[in-house]
């Protein structure tokens, strides 16, 4: 009988050749960067998004680069659509999935006392419930691959307070704990799970927010590296965690934040 993780350790350390991946929300931003990073390392990737036009534009870009990427439309807040997506993935990859990256996430910036029940339910469903459900649905496929990887796209909001993000932060904190639980519960199935927590990253979703000079300067002032991150600085970590080189890393919460979460008080 093979030892746990043996099949992964026997593969080339810095290649994802022969592996398959599902990345949700891959038509733009961090998700798109993750799709490209995994595909450039040799993985066959399936991704989804709600906007079919944007998805097709991205697909044309990937095809022009010779990347092995397929797409489908899916609203991950819908349980039925999540189940349909996983049926598609199972069919595409012959019942085996090497990598799961639930990337879709939304939030609302307002005081806790002003948040509505509808906002709470939608954010929980989109961020946390979908991640939990995708993990459940993917488990048999990840197990069948012989060496499965789950990378949850969390946030520093799940590690420290960001202010006026109580619902969003709660979902991300729960995702970090979910990764730890899955890492322990599914270790015997040769499935690893980790969570990645970005700080402010230059993406279409942060463009307007960071376009405010005062906001950007404030963000940079509390970041030791004194700059906002780039999408490929997050996607490279996600890809690394999926590589055979990272076969002994599981259950970890890793911040990609230019030092923000460890920045204490400095005397003048």
UniProtKB/Swiss-Prot annotation:
Residues engaged in binding substrate: 155
InterPro entries cross-referenced by the UniProt entry: NAD(P)-bd_dom_sf, Sc_DH/Rdtase_CS, SDR_fam, TR
Top-level taxon: Eukaryota
Active site: 168 (proton acceptor)
Recorded GO CC terms: cytosol; peroxisome
GO molecular function: oxidoreductase activity
Key word Oxidoreductase present: yes
Family matches, as SUPFAM superfamilies: NAD(P)-binding Rossmann-fold domains (SSF51735)
Bilayer-crossing regions: none
Chain sites annotated for binding NADP(+): 22-46
EC nos: 1.1.1.-
Pfam families: adh_short_C2
Family: Belongs to the short-chain dehydrogenases/reductases (SDR) family. SDR65C subfamily.
Protein name: Tropinone reductase homolog At2g29370
């Amino acid at each position: 009988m093979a030892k746990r993780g043996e099949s992964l350790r026997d593969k080339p350390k810095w290649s994802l050749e022969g592996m398959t991946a599902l990345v949700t929300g891959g038509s733009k931003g961090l998700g798109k960067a993750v799709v490209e990073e995994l595909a450039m390392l040799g993985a066959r990737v399936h991704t989804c998004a709600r906007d079919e036009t944007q998805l097709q534009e991205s697909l044309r870009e990937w095809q022009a680069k010779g990347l092995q990427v397929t797409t489908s439309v899916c609203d991950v807040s819908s349980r039925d659509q999540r189940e349909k997506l996983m049926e598609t993935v199972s069919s595409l990859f012959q019942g085996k999935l090497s990598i799961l990256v639930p990337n879709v996430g939304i939030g609302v910036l307002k005081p806790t006392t002003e948040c509505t029940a509808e906002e709470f339910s939608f954010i929980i469903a989109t961020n946390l419930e979908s991640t939990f459900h995708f993990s459940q649905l993917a488990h048999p496929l990840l197990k069948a691959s012989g060496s499965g990887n789950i990378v949850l796209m969390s946030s520093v909001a799940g590690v420290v307070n960001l202010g006026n993000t109580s619902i969003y932060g709660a979902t991300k904190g729960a995702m970090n704990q979910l990764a730890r639980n899955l890492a322990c519960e599914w270790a015997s199935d040769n499935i690893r799970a980790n969570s990645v927590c970005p700080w402010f990253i230059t993406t279409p979703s942060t463009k307007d927010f960071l376009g405010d000079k005062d906001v950007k300067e404030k963000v940079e002032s509390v970041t030791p590296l004194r700059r906002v991150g780039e999408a490929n600085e997050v996607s490279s970590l996600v890809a690394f965690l999926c590589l055979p080189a990272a076969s002994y890393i599981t259950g970890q919460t890793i911040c990609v934040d230019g030092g923000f979460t460890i920045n204490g008080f400095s005397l003048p």
